[in-house]
Amino acid sequence: MAPSEKKLTEDKKNSSLNKKIETSNSSSEKSSENNNGDSQNNEAPKTFKELGVIDELCEACEKLGFKTPTPIQQEAIPVVLNKRDVIGLAQTGSGKTAAFALPVIQELWNNPSPFFAVVLAPTRELAYQISEQFEAIGGSIGVRSVVIVGGMDMVTQAVALSKKPHVLVCTPGRLMDHLENTKGFSLKNLKYLIMDEADRLLDMDFGPIIDKILKIIPHERRTLLFSATMTSKVEKLQRASLHQPVRVAVSSKFSTVDTLIQRYLFFPFKHKDTYLVYLVNELAGNSIIIFARTVNDTQRLAILLRTLGFSAIPLHGQLSQSNRLGALNKFKSGARSTLVATDVAARGLDIPLVDVVINYDIPTDSKAYIHRVGRTARAGRAGKSIALVTQYDLEPFLRIEATIGKKMQEYEIDKEGVFLLSERVGEAQREAIIQMKEIHDRRKSKGKLHTKRKRDDLDREEQIY
């Protein structure tokens, strides 16, 4: 028996703790849903304990700074504790990872076993962050989580699987690889399957692989499906994988949160970089994510800002897995105050305390805008977003305003202060062009373009430009 399983088992034998667990479970059975499968929670609980969460996990929540349950946590946790399948719909930044991690860990506490739960995630970064959440919440009771994603060594992962962790957090392609090829690995005792960002999983064409996984894993299991939107593909997956699910919809409307202050700046296209630098300078001391449309602009803007003395770092799909994780960790730790990213960072990544989101490029898809600005003002906190609008962006910008049902106010600036930066920004632009050419030349000389594609390519975060 693995040490963490032994710890869980020994703790469970404590009779007084068993009584507390039984009390928590019985209270969760009284809260929840009607026979139609709709969540009914007339009086929202104010604490995790009122949701049926045991004291040990309530203490973990307190240490992590989870003061009160978010709406999706209030709705989903009692239903999962009542051993029902769940389909959860919630806007971005709602705290849904803890909404499934807490009750699953509590069930693991009651019935410790290896390969207790599998979480499917659309991207590698999201998989690592979900795993971190499981270990942060369940670390005090010995919960072990392993990440199984593409781009990493199969043999090393097989060794990790042989140690029989409690929770696997996977991208679908690599999980299927191990189910087919890793000797001795099976999910025959799986108790929970969780699909996070289900709409994105299906948008990235993981559907056929998920269908294969569903045929292999036990039918007698609980399934939790979380999605930002209810698409026809998600509805089809729900019918195929969930048994009489309870639907918990915190927000059925695709919208931004109320704590987000949204502003825009309008100016001629030729001054775009200068306005960006002005903003980053004005917002110095804040944690900032800048979203650009292409990998090239992401890299160029990071170089431009660094040349001007700002601690910026790029994040995009052409970086190696280790470099992507390194960029995220530097930004999350505060070692870099500005992250310049493509839409690889727009969904799923749990980056705490992002103060400002700047849309350097206005996305043509209004939903992409909502996911981007959802990186700030998360879980009840305040945040700010600023959209850079040129004469070429008016149509998509007006569509975004129509989608969110709000007219944005213009961000107040000192225009004279903007143009005082023009000369310095021009010099930095020229330096960025030189460095970009050097980067492209190095890539060409190393011959890094690969034409052969494997299943792991489905685990990529976005198209390579």
UniProtKB/Swiss-Prot annotation:
<dbReference type="InterPro" id="IPR000629">
    <property type="entry name" value="RNA-helicase_DEAD-box_CS"/>
</dbReference>
<comment type="subunit">
    <text>Interacts with the SSU processome.</text>
</comment>
<dbReference type="GO" id="GO:0005829">
    <property type="term" value="C:cytosol"/>
</dbReference>
<dbReference type="InterPro" id="IPR027417">
    <property type="entry name" value="P-loop_NTPase"/>
</dbReference>
<feature type="compositionally biased region" description="Basic residues">
    <location>
        <begin position="442"/>
        <end position="453"/>
    </location>
</feature>
<comment type="function">
    <text>ATP-dependent rRNA helicase required for pre-ribosomal RNA processing. Involved in the maturation of the 35S-pre-rRNA and to its cleavage to mature 18S rRNA.</text>
</comment>
<feature type="compositionally biased region" description="Basic and acidic residues">
    <location>
        <begin position="1"/>
        <end position="22"/>
    </location>
</feature>
<feature type="region of interest" description="Disordered">
    <location>
        <begin position="442"/>
        <end position="465"/>
    </location>
</feature>
<feature type="domain" description="Helicase C-terminal">
    <location>
        <begin position="275"/>
        <end position="419"/>
    </location>
</feature>
<feature type="region of interest" description="Disordered">
    <location>
        <begin position="1"/>
        <end position="44"/>
    </location>
</feature>
<protein>
    <recommendedName>
        <fullName>ATP-dependent rRNA helicase rrp3</fullName>
        <ecNumber>3.6.4.13</ecNumber>
    </recommendedName>
</protein>
<dbReference type="InterPro" id="IPR014014">
    <property type="entry name" value="RNA_helicase_DEAD_Q_motif"/>
</dbReference>
<dbReference type="GO" id="GO:0003723">
    <property type="term" value="F:RNA binding"/>
</dbReference>
<dbReference type="InterPro" id="IPR001650">
    <property type="entry name" value="Helicase_C-like"/>
</dbReference>
<dbReference type="Pfam" id="PF00270">
    <property type="entry name" value="DEAD"/>
</dbReference>
<dbReference type="InterPro" id="IPR011545">
    <property type="entry name" value="DEAD/DEAH_box_helicase_dom"/>
</dbReference>
<keyword id="KW-0378">Hydrolase</keyword>
<dbReference type="InterPro" id="IPR050079">
    <property type="entry name" value="DEAD_box_RNA_helicase"/>
</dbReference>
<keyword id="KW-0347">Helicase</keyword>
<keyword id="KW-0539">Nucleus</keyword>
<keyword id="KW-0698">rRNA processing</keyword>
<feature type="compositionally biased region" description="Basic and acidic residues">
    <location>
        <begin position="454"/>
        <end position="465"/>
    </location>
</feature>
<keyword id="KW-0067">ATP-binding</keyword>
<dbReference type="GO" id="GO:0003724">
    <property type="term" value="F:RNA helicase activity"/>
</dbReference>
<dbReference type="GO" id="GO:0005634">
    <property type="term" value="C:nucleus"/>
</dbReference>
<dbReference type="GO" id="GO:0005524">
    <property type="term" value="F:ATP binding"/>
</dbReference>
<feature type="short sequence motif" description="DEAD box">
    <location>
        <begin position="196"/>
        <end position="199"/>
    </location>
</feature>
<keyword id="KW-0547">Nucleotide-binding</keyword>
<feature type="short sequence motif" description="Q motif">
    <location>
        <begin position="46"/>
        <end position="74"/>
    </location>
</feature>
<dbReference type="GO" id="GO:0005730">
    <property type="term" value="C:nucleolus"/>
</dbReference>
<comment type="similarity">
    <text>Belongs to the DEAD box helicase family. DDX47/RRP3 subfamily.</text>
</comment>
<dbReference type="Pfam" id="PF00271">
    <property type="entry name" value="Helicase_C"/>
</dbReference>
<dbReference type="GO" id="GO:0006364">
    <property type="term" value="P:rRNA processing"/>
</dbReference>
<dbReference type="InterPro" id="IPR014001">
    <property type="entry name" value="Helicase_ATP-bd"/>
</dbReference>
<keyword id="KW-0694">RNA-binding</keyword>
<dbReference type="GO" id="GO:0016887">
    <property type="term" value="F:ATP hydrolysis activity"/>
</dbReference>
<feature type="compositionally biased region" description="Low complexity">
    <location>
        <begin position="23"/>
        <end position="36"/>
    </location>
</feature>
<keyword id="KW-0690">Ribosome biogenesis</keyword>
<dbReference type="InterPro" id="IPR044765">
    <property type="entry name" value="DDX47/Rrp3_DEADc"/>
</dbReference>
<feature type="binding site">
    <location>
        <begin position="90"/>
        <end position="97"/>
    </location>
    <ligand>
        <name>ATP</name>
    </ligand>
</feature>
<feature type="domain" description="Helicase ATP-binding">
    <location>
        <begin position="77"/>
        <end position="248"/>
    </location>
</feature>
